[in-house]
Each structure stands twice: as C-alpha cells, then as structure tokens.
Amino acid sequence: FGADGREEANMLLRRSSGSDDAPRMLGAFNEETPDWLSFFMFTYFTDRDGKMQLESLAQSGFDPLSRTCRFMLTEEAHHMFVGETGVGRTIQATAEAMNKAGITDPYDINAIRDLGVIDLPTIQKKLNLHYSLSLDLFGQEVSTNAANAFNAGIKGRYMEHRLEDDHKLSNDTYNVKMIKDNHIITEQMPALNAINMRLRDDYVNDASGGLNRWNRTLKRANIDFAFTLPHEGFNRSIGVFSPVSIDPQGNIISIDEWASQASSWLPTKSDGAFIQSLMKPCFEAGEYASWIAPPKVGINNQPGDFEYVQLHMA
C-alpha cells in the first residue's frame, strides 16, 4: 500500500512485461501471436489459466483481493468465449469446405488447404502448443509457496466453497504424477503441498469442455476426426515432466525420437506461413474470410451489421 506498494507494483510490471533482453519467465507469454488462430487458442487455453488463478484468489480471506478477483472473472469469461467460438468457427469453416468439395480424409492436407481453410491436423498442432504452454503456468506440482498461501488464507482452491472437507488439508493427500526410473508413476503427496497440482487438474477438466463441442461439429459434418488434449507431460518446460521428452500419448521417448517427430505434433514454420497467408482483412459488414465461419449470433445478440464502435470526429 502507499508509496511502497506503487514501487513494488512498478517492479512487478517491469518483470512481467518482458523484452528481448529480459524475456518473461513463462513461455506462454513469450509465444508470438501472429494470426487469429493463435489468438483464439491463447484466449481459450492461456486465459483459462487466469480464470483458475482468479477463482482461487476469489476464495481469499483478504476481502479486497477476493472482491477484486470476482469482478475480474467476468472479463476472463468473455476472453474464453472469444477463444472457444473463434476456434469453433474455424473448425466449422473447414468442415463445410471439406463437405462441399467432397473431401472425406482430414489428412489430405494439401487438398484441404487449397480450399482456403485450415486443415484439422494443423489446428490440433496449434492446440497442442498452446495447451502445453498453458500447463506450465501452474508452476511446480509440489510447492511450499502454494501451501503457505493456502494456510495464510491468501488463496484457496478452485471453487473452494463447493468442496466438502475441513478446508484445512492437515492430514489429506493428493495424487501427483512423478518421473521415476524413466517411468511416469503416481504418488500420494500431502494435499497442502499439491495445491498447484489440484488446480492444474481442475484446469484440464475445465478445458476439455470446449473440445467436446468442437468434436460435435465434426461429428455433425460426418468427418472422422477428433481433437484431443495431449498428455500433461507433453512439451513441458516447468515441473516434474520438464527433464524428459514425452509424446502426446504419454510415452517417454528419446531426444532423437522427439526431434524426428516434433513437427507432426507442434506447428512448424511452414504451418505458420500457411496460416499467415490466409490472414487477409475483410472490410464489408457481414463479410468473412474463407477460413472462418460467420458467428451464430453477434455479441449481445446484435445483428451482423451492428456498429459496435462508433467514431465521432471532433
């Protein structure tokens, strides 16, 4: 609070802003957002981490923090709405173009790209990237800092008020995955120390909902393809999985195997260049780019030609 608080806030902003000389500590916030699909994936997956953290801080015993976070959650909800519907409309456009062209094989990538839409395997690769980067935002699976914050009443668990326990966790345990002898195992850890792990599990469950809706779009279009979340150890830079290479199915693989197959799991420069080639502006009301379907309804149920922004010249 006061002058000390302002100084600390300025230093926090400096640390968080990032630059070429001092990049942000977390990879998700160093990743470029060169196209709309990247933006939609960021708002769906990375902003969802913000939702989980804000929900936990909304349980704080420090009332100003709790009330502030509850207000901020309304903004996060809109971010994730933009992300889910944006990715969904991209998938819808691809499905419609494939059906119109009579293409049934989702892996006929060149033919699908020639239609001016983004092929489904590339969308899956973008999903893999942003999901795995977002998992790193939860920090170490076992954390004394998280335990201390919980004990101090600064931060609770996700939807703490719905959990039916003593809310002290003194003698409780929680399952945490570990790497032992080059195998993934599950160990029971003190629940207090596994606060981050539990929050990450809640995130995974929450994030899966959008994938189910995207897959229903493909099912209605009779396209044999389904989006999946990769294993939580895939492409990780923070936590117990960071020292090893793990494929999307959860198998520990060698560095050479990773190097030879990473391009089939994560977007390449050529994938990015193709997506960028589709990013052409449309200036007329009701006109949409080839790679994205029109929205079902406008924001706040407004018509397609509604002027959301009005410019008044002085």
Where on the chain are the PLM-derived regions?
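Glycine- and acidic-residue-rich phosphate-binding/metal-coordinating active-site segment common to enzymes
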Residues: 60-127
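Long, hydrophobic, amphipathic alpha-helical segments used as structural scaffolds
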Residues: 58-61, 84-87, 91-94, 142-145, ...
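Structural signal for well-ordered, non-membrane alpha-helices
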Residues: 55, 77, 81-84, 88, ...
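Short alpha-helical linear motifs
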Residues: 2-6, 90-98, 150-152
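Extended, helix-rich structural scaffolds rather than catalytic motifs
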Residues: 99-314
